[in-house]
Design a protein with these regions (language model features):
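Beta-rich, blade/repeat-based domains predominating
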Residues: 1-6, 35-48, 79-93, 99, ...
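Beta-strand-rich domains and repeat architectures in extracellular enzymes and scaffolds
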Residues: 1-17
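Short loop/turn segments that connect beta-strands within beta-propeller blades
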Residues: 23-27, 65-69, 109-113, 151-155, ...
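A short beta-strand motif characteristic of beta-propeller blades
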Residues: 28-33, 70-77, 114-119, 156-162, ...
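Solenoidal tandem-repeat scaffolds enriched in leucines and small polar residues
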Residues: 83-90, 96-152, 157-160, 167
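Blade-level signature of beta-propeller repeat domains, shared across WD40, Kelch, NHL, RCC1
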Residues: 248-284
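A short loop-to-beta-strand structural motif that recurs across blades of beta-propeller domains
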Residues: 18-20, 59-63, 103-107, 146-149, ...
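Conserved beta-strand positions in repeat-built beta-propeller and related beta-rich domains
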Residues: 10-15, 51-59, 96-102, 138-143, ...
């Protein structure tokens, strides 16, 4: 799911091949069919205010116009068949980058329609992806247990190893300073990589055998995660190194993605087919 430019919230309905839009004020929903065989995974809002969808069923990136619901399809090259598309982010040039869990990452240039796919280091695993405020791109490899720094010109990747071996870097998000926060699924930790000096720090989440899945950093540089063992949304304050947990309304909830806008963090409860929001005091 992803907060939309018009105040609504986009979400993917993976089992029915649709993109949905929710009006949080009225509860009104509209759903847009994406085509036969569609299985949408992630959705983000692009610089054009359109919804951009990673569709593993169609093995394509989709653009959905927010005004007329027209769907434009950008198929992956034949060599990247079965890429198992996951997540996307836009770089500073307006180019969309995507991950495919079957061992792929790539880009779509909306201006030309060109689609490129690259084999990822260590094969299977590319999962979450993020852009920094400067438009640099990093992706997380769950199976590969690394953070990948993408050269947006050449498409080449530099592998960045977290201090904990086999950490299982699942999702990633940039803060306002360009530091990359990661959810370490195997290690039960949240980590941060600072490109300015190449340093890492890690903190273990509270509870027994924590499994952090999604990560999002709000406009205050507070870090939000989802934790599957406790079935909770977790707030981490880097300034005090303290955690606070919130129980979603649904049990089980299994929140697999977090995104937000000032004052709100939105999550998709995959086990309940619901969206959840945590509201907080936003920056002035």
């Amino acid at each position: 799911m992803a907060p939309a430019a018009d105040g609504g919230v986009w979400y993917t309905a993976q089992r029915t091949g649709r993109l949905g839009w929710l009006d949080p004020e009225s509860g009104r929903v509209r759903e847009i069919p994406l085509g036969a065989g569609s299985s949408p995974h992630g959705v983000i809002v692009g610089p054009d205010d359109a919804a951009w969808v990673t569709d593993s069923g169609l093995n394509a990136i989709l653009r959905v116009d927010p005004d007329d619901d027209v769907v434009t399809r950008y198929p992956l090259p034949a060599e990247a068949a079965g890429a198992n598309l996951n997540t996307a982010a836009f770089d500073r040039n307006g180019v969309l980058w995507f991950t495919g869990q079957a061992g792929w990452y790539g880009r779509v240039d909306p201006a030309s329609g060109q689609v490129d796919a690259f084999r990822a280091p260590r094969g299977t695993g590319p999962y979450g992806i993020t852009a920094t405020p400067d438009g640099d791109i990093y992706f997380a490899s769950l199976a590969g247990s690394y953070l990948g720094q993408v050269d947006i010109g050449s498409g080449e990747v530099t592998v960045l190893e977290p201090p904990t071996a086999g950490a299982g870097v699942r999702r990633a998000w940039s803060d306002s300073k360009g530091r990359i926060w990661v959810a370490e699924w195997n290690a039960g930790q949240v980590g941060v990589y600072d490109p300015s000096d190449g340093s890492w720090r890690e903190w273990r989440l509270p509870g027994d055998s924590p499994q952090p899945y999604a990560v999002y950093v709000d406009e205050l540089d507070v870090v939000w995660l989802t934790e599957f063992t406790a079935d909770a949304i977790v707030r981490f304050d880097p300034l005090t190194a303290t955690f606070r947990s919130f129980a979603p309304p649904s049990v089980p909830s299994a929140v697999r993605q977090l995104l937000g806008r000032p004052g709100e963090v939105w999550g998709a409860e995959s086990a309940a087919d619901r969206l959840v929001v945590v509201r907080y005091a936003a920056a002035d």
